[in-house]
Structure formats: C-alpha cells, structure tokens
Amino acid sequence: MQYKKTLVASALAATTLAAYAPSEPWSTLTPTATYSGGVTDYASTFGIAVQPISTTSSASSAATTASSKAKRAASQIGDGQVQAATTTASVSTKSSAAAVSQIGDGQIQATTKTTAAASLKLVMVKIQATTKTTAAAVSQIGDGQVQATTKTTAAAVSQITDGQVQATTKTTQAASQVSDGQVQATSATSASAAATSTDPVDAVSCKTSGTLEMNLKGGILTDGKGRIGSIVANRQFQFDGPPPQAGAIYAAGWSITPDGNLAIGDNDVFYQCLSGTFYNLYDEHIGSQCTPVHLEAIDLIDC
C-alpha cells in the first residue's frame, strides 16, 4: 500500500515539474528551443496586431501583400487578457496597424468587426494603437488575458484586467487601455521609430490611453503594468504578476522574429480561439473554433 502511494505521489510530482510553482524562479520557464535570428531585446515599447495565416496562399504572396494590408492590433483588458476584434477597418500607412487591446486582468482581446474606429473599451483595461504598416492593435483586459478580432484587417486586440489577451471578430484600427486595465488600439505612423535594415518591426500604430504596450528584455515580455507575459496552464497567452500565474508553462523565451512576429521559443504561430465576441490567444490549437495567426509586432506612437 505504501509502495502504491509512493508511485502515485511520484507521478503527480512529475506532471508538475514543467509548470511554475510560486517557490521557483519563474524566469527559467522557457522553451528548450529558440527562434533562429530572433531578437530577445527590443529597445522600444511595442504592441501586437493579429494577422491570420492563410493556408491556401504561398508565403511569397503573403509577403508581397503584407505592406498593403491593414492589420488588426490587439487590445488588453484590466486583468491582463489580450483580445482581438473580428472585423477589418481602414487604417493609415507605414504599414499602419490597429493595436490589440488589454483589459485590467491582463487578458488580451481583439474585435470581430470591421470599423475604422478604435476597438471598444471594456470595463477592465483596454489598449488601442495604429500604423507603420496599418494594423489593428490587440487589446488586453484587466486580468492579463489577450484577445483579438475575427476578421482580416485592422481590428485591435485588447487586454482585460486579469491579464488575459482577447481579440474581437471585426477589424478596428487601434487599441487603447482604460483605467481598469483594458487595452484597445488605433492607427498612425511613427517618425521616431523609423525602420532600419536591422529593425524587424515595420508597422506602427497610434498609442492611446489603454493601448497594450509591451517591452521585451532578455527574452522576458512585460506589459505597461509590469506584468509578465506568459503561457499559462490552459495554453493561453496573458500577463500576470510578477510572479506569473501558478502553473504557468512559459514565462520567458520570447523574441521578435526576423519577419517581425512575436515568438515563444522557436514557435511564431499562435491560435485565436473564439470566445463570445472575442478571440483569446493560445500557443497551441485547443479546439475547432481556433485558427492560426501571427502576432505582428508594431511600434506605438503618440498621435
């Protein structure tokens, strides 16, 4: 009997080794592989725009059309979630992008409809932004979650106060962040952050109150509130802490690829999964309502 109990305890311990426990150094929660040529330190504050990955068009044709496409930026609501909208909106140029918004809990969200205005504010915390190549910014809600919209142009992802990231189903221009932590975005070009041959970021978006703002240093991603960008136990991308949420899988190992996309480890493909009127963002395919996307990095400017 004692032997069986020991085996069960050992099995349970093994399943938790890959996840974060509060007593452990969270900065070691990093994938084993790294993205070739990825930048782990970026000097400027930036946002992200959700770019759907077409399974029918070639990579070369996608590259050809990228500069002319309006992109959706993610917003963040107060809890840290990141969200993106589901529709597209017309935006300005460097390639201008509507920013993803963030709500107060850290979630990131993006809208689902196509409007030229900034993504809607959530009661938590949203972030809005636009432009360089025009893209709708992803929003973040107060809990740190990140969400994004469902359509192909400039809608912004938001983050709510708990750190989750969500995106709406329509395209809006930029993501802004409201007092409760939600993030919404709008669009504009930046004169200060001109792209160079070594700068992987070639899109810009207007920064407004509530825009999901991120910094990348040493492979660690933080939002405007200093919360840690992580992949949590359910594979969702959101911001928490510090320290990150107990059970987090990755809290370091972030980079910007040579193509200007956000990556965790050697992976730059994320999934937007429909949750009501917003998409939540994940690093793995978790269900039938999930589609592959790139999270394009966008410079944020005051407009």
Swiss-Prot record:
Family listed: Belongs to the PIR protein family.
Superkingdom as given in the UniProt entry: Eukaryota
Gene Ontology biological process terms, A to Z: fungal-type cell wall organization
UniProt entry tagged with the keyword Cytoplasm: no
One Pfam family matching this protein: PIR1-like_C
PIR1/2/3 repeats: 71-89, 97-113, 114-134, 135-153, 154-171, 172-190
Subcellular location: Secreted, Cell wall
Gene Ontology MF terms: structural constituent of cell wall
Role description: Component of the outer cell wall layer. Required for stability of the cell wall and for optimal growth. Required for resistance against several antifungal and cell wall-perturbing agents and for tolerance to heat shock.
Gene: HSP150
Site feature Covalent attachment to cell wall glycan, where: Q81, Q107, Q145, Q164, Q182
Protein name, entry field: Cell wall mannoprotein HSP150
